[in-house]
């Protein structure tokens, strides 16, 4: 430690050479035919001390892992009979006692040793049952460090060659699978089996990585995992899901999706969830196989990874803790170095292989069922439906609707949400997972929160609904760990409530979680971003179920199928819509609540795919399809509204409208989906709406009138018809308004900022007028019009939805005062501010111009705004006085006038400049009173010049100075005495140049 060779050797070997010889970290020691070979991290073989010395003394050779004071004979023992201890310099407490005395080299070696040790311990804990655990550990340790793996690989072939190890692993994987199959061995083995890598034919490395990731996740849940520890987790994910999802969370889906589509991801996740009910007890026996996948899925989540892989999260977590305990240095270094290689290499290739492997096992059979996972996604809002146990039920449900394609999987989920028998299990599963078993599901939420967004994003591309489902199912496995991350999951929870509603079994439980606050949290920014690609991020987050349902691929199908289901399932009465979990049995009750959500989702979700690309057409179709649902009966709309808690004018239809809390967390009366949406929307829209938070009548939104303007019209008329009140009359946003406006607008605002498609939607609806709802998401001047009482907030919302119809806003607003509302939007500065993307630039300019032009003095105060340019102004202000200061402001504006409107100011400036000169004459306030006359003459003569020169100075410093000097000279000629005063006004305006000239002229 102190640089003493003996001490260092003792640290390494723990004693003289006779004692076990430590192998430096990253180095390998092989005995072949009685000869000892040391393999350096770079792969060089050293067979003797002389060769070793030569190697170490050579430049450009790899000396990683060697302690700083290196005693070659003690470190490199070529006695084939000498006992060997792996570990090297970093092994033993002595090596870590005096880190302050270690040189950088040794510190690195110790850090690496610590990192390896932590990885190995993690692997050992997580995969105690696997025979290959030693290799696993080695693999893991090498896996994270890009360089070391090769070094260790030689000793462990699997490690050495990722592919090679995989082949070897495959056998072990099968074993792992059997163990997984066995409920008892399911969880611990699963990690090694997490070898889902095995399915993916990933090598033990993956398994260890899976283990490692799980440990890593606990310490730095999201970040840590992502970093070094996550390297393994990432590799695991890559093995499981990465290819499809492309994000850590994908692991669940990836396990099966690599081979299959996102739908399959869902199915895989479902399959694994049922098998794993990794959530621990849920389905230990059944879930073994799935458990493996779920673990991987959980790996996706970082923490969830640990939970999922363990199936028994605790086991994984325990191991996980050690890795992080290892050392912040190691973790940091590992994160910086290891994550890229293991994540990049392991994730995609391995993800594909594992997914195939997983898919090939039971997952392949249940994949059809996975589609119900989509329901979970819808219910849980994506990542949340991680319940693997329940996923089993959903899996069966999908069977009735074995829709391989995204839309079809969504349909089954939708059907289940609607209350179809098939969805029943999935719903109960999803609702229970998402809502009902928040305690149980917390881990899933964590998954969803941690990595679900990413999974969602990847999933959405292939099958939004399915993707969500797969993610949800994946989170389920890691649910236990997710609990800590539950907050992130909240949005999933909300979504799950909707699902639960469809189920009807888990609403009560789910609702409490929602009440917890996590349930209602909108999707995390990550989730929103991930979802934004497919649809409105806010919409997705706010409307967990609808969003997942309305994901672009399935949205058209879903909307129609949902509508058909709703229509066929019987027009859901308002009550059915609200019916709590109690009504899950009757498809109509669950369906109806789902119906409104689905309708909303279809409206919003199609926008992601249809509306975003062709905003005008999709809305009409969606609305048209939506209208039937609305037509189903105002009761249905009312029921939804009540679920939303927005009775609005029609308080009666909304049983729960009275209480926002009930709306937000309706235990059973309102569908979970509605509750989730309503809670978020109501929270967002109820406050802004000022008194009529209810007005969320999504159903009422559709108007029998024109489908294109159906959004707006729907807002106005449908609200009245369905709710029995005129949303437009009340001016409050009806159910749709709160749901769509709060979630939609909020999401739209986020989309407007990020997604290109959404902006298109938002821009047209400048009239979204979130302002009514208290939402600032209005892109352009939409808010003011909507704000006008004439146009109901709902109309604004619908307009925003109608954005595609281009100018449906006017039609929508007309009922109330569309023209006026629309006009105000562009004109209103707040709107412009709210919706800078659309109209803000134009209106703001006029306002600024008018405001600035109207009061230049005010601008003085505002001069601070132009303080940048105004540095010179202060000087001017000194000489010119208050009047000149305004002039300076004007000049500055003139400088800016280029952009905003110099024309107006230029004349004013002229006046000001002349004025300044005149003031000098008459007021002489700024300068010498006696000289004002001459000044006025002089100034009058050069005022134009002065203006130009000053402008020139600002534009071009040197030319301006020259011109100013010439002016000064000219003005000075008439009266040298006046020079000081005359030059001063122009000089004051220019600033320093004037000062310099003054100095020159004064003498």
Curated annotation (Swiss-Prot):
Swiss-Prot/TrEMBL domain comment: Possesses a methyl-binding domain (MBD) that is necessary for chromocentric localization. The MBD may lack methyl-binding activity.
Tissues in which the protein is found: Expressed at highest levels in adult testis.
Superkingdom per UniProt: Eukaryota
Other observations noted: Named 'methyl-CpG-binding domain protein' for homology to other methyl-CpG-binding domain proteins and the presence of an MBD domain, MBD5 and MBD6 may have evolutionarily lost the ability to bind methylated DNA and are recruited to heterochromatin by alternative signals.
GO cellular component: chromosome; nucleus
Signal peptide range in chain numbering: none
Protein name: Methyl-CpG-binding domain protein 6
Subcellular localization, as worded in the UniProt entry: Nucleus; Chromosome
Molecular function GO labels: chromatin binding
Keywords: Chromosome, Nucleus, Ubl conjugation pathway
Gly residues bias (residue ranges): 636-650
Domain MBD as annotated: residue spans: 13-83
UniProt function note: Non-catalytic component of the polycomb repressive deubiquitinase (PR-DUB) complex, a complex that specifically mediates deubiquitination of histone H2A monoubiquitinated at 'Lys-120' (H2AK119ub1). Important for stability of PR-DUB components and stimulating its ubiquitinase activity. As part of the PR-DUB complex, associates with chromatin enriched in histone marks H3K4me1, H3K4me3, and H3K27Ac, but not in H3K27me3. MBD5 and MBD6 containing complexes associate with distinct chromatin regions enriched in genes involved in different pathways.
Subunit relationships: Core component of the polycomb repressive deubiquitinase (PR-DUB) complex, at least composed of BAP1, one of ASXL1, ASXL2 or (probably) ASXL3, and one of MBD5 or MBD6. Distinct combinations of ASXL and MBD proteins may preferentially bind specific histone modification marks. The PR-DUB core associates with a number of accessory proteins, including FOXK1, FOXK2, KDM1B, HCFC1 and OGT; KDM1B specifically associates with ASXL2 PR-DUB complexes.
